[in-house]
């Protein structure tokens, strides 16, 4: 995100940093999509706090990782109990695209599928070549 301003912060819980929260609020959006390393700390802490404040928070579980499988899974359980939604990257991409007739972002989504979704991305590329689209 080269055009994004870096926010220098000291809080472990990002959502405790007023500068971060103000930047998010300024977007006017009501839904947060969060993923990151150390699911049990860097993801769970802001998710639980933001959900508690009434934000619609979704955690992308397969784009997050904890120090162990157990800590990742326990953090996910905590976030669900706090009111967060969970989904995978592929589910998120599908919900955002919804209809392949919506062509405005198909090229970008196709690149993401090819680069990051292994066999699914290759299958999609192959299908597009067969359909000559």
Residue ranges of model-derived segments:
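Active-site-adjacent betaalpha module
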Residues: 1-133
